[in-house]
């Protein structure tokens, strides 16, 4: 978990592949200024290649918002999404957030429900 300046390169690579290339979300919608102020998680494989990412925004005082959670297709189903989500939840708790909201696609609802949301 870290800031955008330290994790941007890897996070951008995963998000571009998942959101822009795979899901056809326009790059202009995927990228926003909120990244600069968010906490980010980046999970790399043994070869140090980025495999999963997500971010935690401060929605309001004491309220975090998790979003942009993405796992490369070849690593889905292996638990990386769960690891990334838990890392962001831990960062929210450490920051003192009393509540955490999700900003996610409805197609991922079953994943988040299985994680307690």
Language model segments and positions:
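Short amphipathic alpha-helix that is part of the acyltransferase structural core
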Residues: 1-40, 44-49
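Short alpha-helical functional segments enriched in proximate histidine and acidic residues
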Residues: 18, 91, 111
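Conserved beta-strand in the GNAT
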Residues: 42, 49-58, 62-70
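Structured catalytic cores of enzymes that bind and process phosphorylated ligands/cofactors
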Residues: 50, 71-72, 80, 100
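Conserved acetyl-CoA-binding loop-helix of GNAT-fold acetyltransferases
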Residues: 71, 77-90
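Conserved GNAT acetyl-CoA-binding A-motif
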Residues: 85, 92-105
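Conserved acetyl-CoA-binding loop of GNAT-fold acetyltransferases
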Residues: 113-117
């Amino acid at each position: 978990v870290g800031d955008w300046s330290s994790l941007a390169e890897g996070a951008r690579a995963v998000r571009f592949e998942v959101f822009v290339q795979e899901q056809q979300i326009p790059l202009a919608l995927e990228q926003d200024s909120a990244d600069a102020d968010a906490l980010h998680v980046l999970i790399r494989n043994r070869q140090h290649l980025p495999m999963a990412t997500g971010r935690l925004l401060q929605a309001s005082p004491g309220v975090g918002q998790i979003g942009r959670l993405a796992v490369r297709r070849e690593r889905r189903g292996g638990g990386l999404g769960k690891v990334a989500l838990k890392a962001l939840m831990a960062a929210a708790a450490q920051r003192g957030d009393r509540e955490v909201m999700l900003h996610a696609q409805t197609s991922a609802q079953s994943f988040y429900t299985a994680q307690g949301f």
